[in-house]
Amino acid sequence: MKTAFVFPGQGSQKVGMLQDLYNAYPIVKKRFEEADEALGYSISKLCFEGPDTELVKTANTQPAILTASVACYEVLKENGFTPDIVGGHSLGEYSALVAAGVLNFKDAVYVVHKRGEYMQEAVPLGKGAMAAILALPREQVVEICQQVNDTVGSVQAVNFNCPGQIVIAGETAAVETAAEKMKEAGAKRAVMLPVSAPFHSRLMEPAAARLKEELDKIQVNDANIPVVANVTGKILTNASDIKDSLVTQAANPVLWEDCVAEMVNFGVTRFVEVGPGKVLTGFTKKINKEMELANVEDIPSLEKTLEFLKGVR
């Protein structure tokens, strides 16, 4: 009977997130103040007041979600609950690494802000795109990407989220062509995503190289809680392996389905999504229907999850 804490990635942000927890818990306020200090501008104000047009910029979204997620984790910890294993989706992996003692919180806030900047600068606006492909088998998605790659331009599968949901990314024309072909091949839907860059695609390689320079400047520790890496779907605890996997992750697919399978294999029966939204809860439900699921993003969900965790002690 083990518990995993999992941390969300980009797309889960919303103006007003964490406001009630910020008002109720000094530790939440402290984390937001530390984030403001690390960034040199008020991410708190952006989270609570917006505007949304600024919050959705990846260089802001990334530190905002990381701060909100780590703050939720601190509240669980203050209440006496810690996980047996952690993982995070894309950006969420950094939140998981703070929880596992691998990264110092303020370092992580600064690094993900830079990660956002570098990802945005790697591909000019409008030149890259992402699309979610629903209900088409993994093999077919990969095969069509390969065909389009050989004829139109760079495109690849970049998020294996759960059965029936895979995200592709690359050059805009190639992504549009691949999405069209996937619909013809029987995909239930192929939806272009409102993102500003083709995250986790090969086009992010310049960002990965610059990210490595940032990671080289900060302290990276061995994990004190096992962490499941996005790029392999396997457990890592060694500092240098973790650092390498973060660099690789910027320009390679997120194997979320494999990450969840690894946690289940580790003995996990309960997943708690720590941070804004319930995206990962939805994925987990589709990957394994046997799991008990909870989340923490505000006071009502926190109270419910504390009851749930007390009940299974």
Q: Model-predicted segments: where are they?
A:
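FabD-like malonyl-/acyl-CoA
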Residues: 1-141, 270-300
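Short, solvent-exposed amphipathic alpha-helical segments in soluble enzyme
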Residues: 22-23, 147-149, 183-185, 286-289, ...
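Non-catalytic positions within long, well-ordered alpha-helices that form the structural scaffold/packing
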Residues: 77, 183, 264-265
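Alpha/beta catalytic cores of group-transfer enzymes, especially the acyltransferase/condensing modules
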Residues: 10-12, 39, 101-251
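Cys-dependent protein tyrosine phosphatase-like superfamily
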Residues: 1-2, 220-230, 235, 244, ...
